[in-house]
């Protein structure tokens, strides 16, 4: 009986040690991933900023990635130019409204 307890204790110790090593490796991988995501966030274009030169570089919002929305602007000289900005499309706004309403109702 004593030998069984010693073997079980040894196995528990080995399993806990190996799982803690795995957790440390996982934390290191997550840290590298978070650092890469942070670098991406710094390079993306925030909401309401101009994205005319980089139409696919908008940042992520709460639920969806912002979309580059373009409009035609008439300058004081009468010249028409296209200007784009990162924003939330109407169908994404509606989805966010429904999700927010659902959270209020269901907790």
From Swiss-Prot:
UniProt cross-references to PROSITE patterns, sorted A to Z: SPIDER_CSTX
Cysteines joined through disulfide linkages: 44-59, 51-68, 58-86, 70-84
Compartments, as annotated in UniProt: Secreted
Keyword terms, alphabetized: Disulfide bond, Knottin, Secreted, Signal, Toxin
Pfam families (alphabetical): Toxin_35 (PF10530)
Main location: secreted
Proregion residues excised on maturation: 21-41
Expressed in which tissues: Expressed by the venom gland.
GO function terms (MF aspect): toxin activity
A Gene Ontology cellular-component term: extracellular region
Signal peptide: 1-20
Entry's family note: Belongs to the neurotoxin 19 (CSTX) family. 04 (U1-Lctx) subfamily.
Comment, domains: The presence of a 'disulfide through disulfide knot' structurally defines this protein as a knottin.
Protein name (database record): U1-lycotoxin-Ls1r
Native source species: Lycosa singoriensis (Wolf spider)
